[in-house]
Amino acid sequence: MMKNILAIQSHVVYGHAGNSAAEFPMRRLGANVWPLNTVQFSNHTQYGKWTGCVMPPSHLTEIVQGIAAIDKLHTCDAVLSGYLGSAEQGEHILGIVRQVKAANPQAKYFCDPVMGHPEKGCIVAPGVAEFHVRHGLPASDIIAPNLVELEILCEHAVNNVEEAVLAARELIAQGPQIVLVKHLARAGYSRDRFEMLLVTADEAWHISRPLVDFGMRQPVGVGDVTSGLLLVKLLQGATLQEVLEHVTAAVYEIMVTTKAMQEYELQVVAAQDRIAKPEHYFSATKL
């Protein structure tokens, strides 16, 4: 049975970020994606200039009311939220999550708590980080912070893999069943590898892959693709190990393809066959 995912995050007309990055790879893995855009920008913000607008929070609710009106909301298997244009959008998204779960009690809420990295040019509105700590975290079934976001959510420093597992379990105690730490960075075992953790109350899986060197300008949207693919694989019933291994390899294929084509924007279409069937393999280790 094909899974239906309501994906509520940013959209760029040119290039790949938010839904513009994740939607196609998720579909390539066999999911129906219902993209609902929190912002519509000309391009992602790391170019330093862009045009477009943040959607009014009521717009998100109105679109979902339309889906409910044609009696299709019960077919939604999960809500995915990513980049928010405002904290008020977050409150409306939680209302949407409640509405979806009322229609389908088995539906999951996957929160990608994008909180911004000013040094990278990723900017979020005031109040968004606080929204995730107070409201997004306890409402989520699955949450996918990077290291900086993990530290904000658990409200203390995380310096190594063991501390990251403990921090993930602190989050689990507040609501979610699954935590993906999308990028361990300085808390990982090795500075020259890209490492991730997938943690539940009683399991923790670690994986690493080579870093792909893009020089000064790292492509945007890698986390969005990672979250989207992870949600698809979880909904399809893969084990935690299978999920982590496939997602890591698929994202690596996109990165390698992008680098080989000497592009800055993620080359998700060019890499599509290797998203579905990666040529590389990375083994996850149970901690």
UniProtKB/Swiss-Prot annotation:
Alphabetical UniProt keywords: ATP-binding, Kinase, Magnesium, Nucleotide-binding, Transferase
A GO term for molecular function: ATP binding
Transmembrane spans: none
Annotated GO CC locations: cytosol
Protein residues bound to substrate: 10, 45-46, 224
EC number(s) on file: 2.7.1.35
Record-listed ATP binding positions: 112, 144, 149, 182, 209-212
Pathway of action: Cofactor metabolism; pyridoxal 5'-phosphate salvage; pyridoxal 5'-phosphate from pyridoxal: step 1/1
Catalytic activity line of the entry: pyridoxal + ATP = pyridoxal 5'-phosphate + ADP + H(+)
Purpose: Pyridoxal kinase involved in the salvage pathway of pyridoxal 5'-phosphate (PLP). Catalyzes the phosphorylation of pyridoxal to PLP.
NCBIfam families (UniProt xref): PRK05756.1, pyridox_kin
Family: Belongs to the pyridoxine kinase family. PdxY subfamily.
Protein's UniProt name: Pyridoxal kinase PdxY
Organism: Shigella sonnei (strain Ss046)
Lineage of the species this protein comes from: Bacteria, Pseudomonadati, Pseudomonadota, Gammaproteobacteria, Enterobacterales
Gene coding for it: pdxY
